[in-house]
Amino acid sequence: MEELQRHFEIDGSRQQRFIYPFLFQEYIYALAHYYALNGSIFYETVENLGYDKKSSSLIVKRLITRMHRQNRLIISINDSNQNRFIGHNKNLYTQTVSEGFAVIMEIPFSLRLVFSLEEKEISKSHNLRSIHSLFPFFEDKLSHLNHVSHILIPHPAHLEILVQILHCWIQDAPSLHLLRFFLHDYHNSKSINAQKKSIFVCSKENRRFFSFIYNFHVYESELMFVFLRKQSSHLRSTSFGTVLERTHFYGKIEHLVVVLRNDFQKTLWLFKDPFMHYVRYQGKSILASKGTHLRMKKWKSYLVLFWQSHFYLWSQPERIRINQLYNHSFYFLGYLSGVRRNPSVVRSQMLENSFLIETSIKKFETLVPITPLIGSLAKAKFCNVSGHPISKPSWADLSDSDIINRFGRIYRNFSHYHSGSSKKQTLYQIKYILRLSCARTLARKHKSTVRAFLKRLGSKFLEEFLTEEEQVLSLIFPRTPSPSYRSHRERIWYLDIIYINILTNHV
């Protein structure tokens, strides 16, 4: 790992960085296997893995030879059982090399992340990966803005565009040819059965490789936007960084910025907006501004033209929707978010004259929609489509404690993820559904009625189903007579949540 770090060390020079020699390092494939199991990026050292750093060109030579050999056999053998078996092995070899290629490409961007965090003196950078870290940003910014746009990030229509994008970073021809081989090989294998599917629909076999390709595509699409945003603002941007799903990208392409500065200097006045904010999530993005509706339409036109000119991709205008914040709510990561106005009247008296002053305070609200959650619970067989709790027959063979723990853990996950809701009535309804579904499952197991079963267990069943949030709040606010009342009002954001709730994600 130290050898790789020295090779990709960030300095001011424009040295040539050759990728392909590392494909002949045996520990690269050990790293790919290790990080595929752990789903992390490269902060650890290779010594922790217990692998040696010995070179083995024989491994890669065998893989390449077998791939070419299988290609010839597939051409000569048509529609036979052996052909299907050979195709499976070919995919396995391609997967091995592509995962190693992705490992090598992720390292320089991981180093850029570490360098940027150290330069900005950001401590506890792992908190930036939390999904909940976006909501405090919304609370602080959106209440002062007027318009919001929802953008569906498009995908490039041609694979060569992806190769040209990565050409700015990969400067050796063999690696570019290898990248082109991976993309076209995957595209050809999938085009027969799924011609309409995007190349970015990551398969389980090549998840890391295509996650890296997708992240780099998004990084490139945001690069010009960030440049224009910085140029159009009179105030210096205090912080900027893109935190992606799998790999963290920081930095700019210097020569590309020079070209853009020459091309767009005359049109920058169209985009002068010091109150523009941008958030990306799950292949979508949100653009919020304090400007007028006309200014948002200019940003919309710019994005459409940018996708067409830079990626040669025709994007439908309906991909970008513009709405006013104070009368529009948007679904965001399991929450129904929006800005609500609280009108108030203040009476002011000066000598013998009195005045009535009408004011309104904007407040960012995060609500949990009940209908989608009931739909996801119905899919998981905890209730019917109308929200009536039903038993879980597949869990009836478990012990009583395991059944109670499973239902309790599901609700605690719900409560933990949706702890930032402005109103908790939805969570109380979810608690009722899961608690009664648990009771029905236990009653079904013991061939009893729900009423008789609850009467036999008493309050012990309810105590084991109590949420941890109410217990913690009762310790933090001991003087509050009712912890549930306090939990009904408080919004809590946890910085340890890096995955969306699985049932919420079904919506």
UniProtKB/Swiss-Prot annotation:
Organism ancestry: Eukaryota, Viridiplantae, Streptophyta, Embryophyta, Tracheophyta
Subcellular location: Plastid, Chloroplast
Name this polypeptide is given: Maturase K
Stretches that traverse the bilayer: none
Family: Belongs to the intron maturase 2 family. MatK subfamily.
Key words, A-Z: Chloroplast, mRNA processing, Plastid, RNA-binding, tRNA processing
PANTHER family: MATURASE K
Main location: plastid
Keyword tRNA processing: yes
Residues in coiled coil: none
GO BP annotations, alphabetical order: mRNA processing; RNA splicing; tRNA processing
Pfam families linked: Intron_maturas2, MatK_N
HAMAP family membership: MatK
GO terms of molecular function: RNA binding
InterPro entries: Domain_X, Maturase_MatK, Maturase_MatK_N
GO cellular component: chloroplast
Function statement: Usually encoded in the trnK tRNA gene intron. Probably assists in splicing its own and other chloroplast group II introns.
